[in-house]
Each structure stands twice: as C-alpha cells, then as structure tokens.
Design a protein with these regions (language model features):
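Metal-dependent DNA phosphodiester-chemistry modules and their immediately adjacent helices/loops
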Residues: 83-84, 149, 177-179, 215-246
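Intrinsic-disorder/low-complexity coil detector
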Residues: 5, 62, 242, 284-286
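Conserved functional hotspot residues or short segments at active or partner-binding sites
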Residues: 50, 236-237, 251-256, 260-298
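Short acidic (Asp/Glu) and glycine-rich catalytic loops that position anionic groups and cofactors
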Residues: 14-18, 117-119, 240-248
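Extracellular repeat-rich scaffold modules on cell surfaces
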Residues: 9-12
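Short intrinsically disordered coil segments
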Residues: 75-80, 111-113, 237-242, 281-284
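Cleft-lining beta-strand/loop regions that shape enzyme active-site pockets
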Residues: 3-6, 16, 21, 26-218, ...
Length: 298
C-alpha cells in the first residue's frame, strides 16, 4: 500500500522528513486544513512545494481520489495488523481481516485463511465489517475437523479433512461490525467455535433486500429477513452480539497507534498455546499384525 502512494512515485522525489509548504502555489500555513487545497484535484497534476532542511523543492504529484486513498489506508492497516501479530507471536499466529461478507470477500478469506491454516493460532478480525451473506460458507470451513493424516516417506504431512485449521482461534468484533458480520459472530458464539474479543456489535440483524425496484428505476430497501435462534429467540437485531472478553479501543490511544483489542487477542492466544499446546502430527511405528489369514502354521 505505501508503495502505491502518490508521494512514493520515483519521479516525485519526496522523502521522509520533507515538509509540505505549498500546493499549487498556495501556502499551507494560511489555511486550517491542507485537504482544502486538494478539493477536485484527484488524478490531476498538482504543484507540490517541499522544504528539505534549508532547501525549497518544487515537484509534481498526482493525488488519488478519496476512494483509492481509503482503500490504500485500509490495506495498510490490515498489513500493519498482520505484521504486528507475526512479530508478537514469532510467526505462530496468523491474522486475517474480513472487510465485508460479499463475493469479493470470498477471495480474500480463501487467500488469507489457507495461507494461515497450519498456524498454531489465528485471529479472524470482523471489526468494521460491512455485511453481506457468506457467513455460512466461512463457518463451514471453521467447523472442519482433522480426524486422520497422511505422512509420505518424503514430504509434508496432510490432514484429513484437508486444509483443516487445528489451532486456537479468536474472533475480533466491535460496535461497527454490521449485518452479516454480526451473523457470523453470532454463529461463532452459538457453535462454540471461538471466543469473541472486542465490543458489542451494531445490532442490525434484520437483513435488507434490494429487489424492490420502483418505476423510476429507484429502489426501496425494506428490512424483511429477521433471524432467530433455533429455539425461536430473536438474535442480533436491536442488541447485537456481546463479546466474551470486552476490550475497548479508546479514541486517543487509537489515534496514537495503539490497538488494545488486537493486543488482547494476541495475548489470549499466546496464553492458550502455553496451556494447550498444539500437538504436532506424528505417526507411530506400524504395529505387529501377525501372519496372514491364508498362511497355515503348525
């Protein structure tokens, strides 16, 4: 993500420590927010004035639109979280974030889950999840259990069922976990798959449909799919899913780069791995079987 930043382009020649002094000839010290000078400038060449030590430099930069900027910031956040988890666990714990629960997120989950399925621990992060409808597909993968394994003379061991995660799992959720992200969290709770860490989810449990079109090509979205527990209780709607371990990310600490929820998930899994280490797959010598049935012995 960082390499895709407009300032990272080699022809811009911006360096860490440079001070932005002006945009299109207008000094940034004369305005309250520098972004005011970037309005309607996406994908247009902008004259960027930099100060490097005592040297003034002018260069050309082409800003991204706000959507691209948001995507790059998101990818940077996910990458930073993954690096933090890997460093804290020495590579024993994996991390994946689900942005939403749509068709594009199937690809994201498959890529990240099957990269990490052989780790001793895994954090599935559904904070800020925007919903969709793939909760059952994901939960199905998490319910798979290894009951046997193959061990060739040369090569790696392979569990049956294949690509089964055998380690300790934790799910991160918060007050911005929405719709199918909440259904996923509720399923994790109901099926006792993993503990949930974070904050109570949004409470939007009645699904909407976009099939109600009107004559002017508009759409009337109607809440029409409530969900219930097997015993008939309303779940999610109006209340959300409460975490097993409540941890809040406070504003100033979050602004300063601290993620208490992620740190709690790492700490929880590290403790679990001490208390319940994951036993490696290891085959025993073949037992003695005796003589074949068609061999007669005296």
């Amino acid at each position: 993500p960082l390499s895709a930043s407009p300032l990272a382009r080699i022809e811009v020649d911006a360096q860490e420590g440079d001070v932005i002094a002006s945009l299109n000839g207008k000094k940034v010290t004369n305005i309250a927010d520098v972004t005011q000078l970037l309005r309607n400038q996406d994908n247009k060449q902008v004259l960027l004035g930099l100060v490097r030590g005592k040297i003034a430099i002018n260069t050309i930069v082409t800003p991204h639109d706000i959507g691209t900027d948001a995507k790059l910031r998101y990818l940077d956040w996910v990458e930073h979280n993954g690096d933090k988890v890997a460093k804290a666990s020495k590579g024993n714990i994996g991390y994946l974030h689900l942005y939403a629960m749509g068709s594009g997120d199937v690809e994201s989950f498959a890529r990240e889950f099957y990269t990490n399925y052989d780790k001793e621990g895994l954090i599935i992060d559904v904070r800020r999840n925007r919903g969709g409808n793939i909760d059952s597909w994901i939960i199905e993968k998490l319910l798979r259990r290894a009951w046997a394994f193959w061990q060739p003379t040369h090569g790696s061991k392979n569990a049956n069922m294949q690509q089964t995660f055998r380690g300790h799992l934790v799910v991160l959720a918060d007050q911005m976990t929405y719709s199918d992200g909440e259904t996923f969290s509720a399923g994790i709770r109901a099926l006792n798959i993993a503990p949930i860490i974070g904050k109570q989810t949004a409470g939007a449990g009645v699904w909407l449909s976009g099939r109600n079109s009107v004559t002017d090509k508009g759409m009337a979205r109607v809440a029409e799919y409530p969900q219930y527990a097997i015993d008939g209780r309303w779940i999610v709607e109006g209340h959300g899913v409460e975490p097993d371990i409540e941890v809040d990310n406070l504003p100033y600490a979050t602004f300063s780069g601290k993620d208490a929820q992620l740190e709690a998930a790492i700490s929880y899994l590290k403790d679990e791995l001490v208390k319940q280490p994951i036993k490696p797959l290891s085959g025993l010598p073949i037992p003695k079987t005796g003589s074949a049935a068609d061999i007669k012995t005296k």
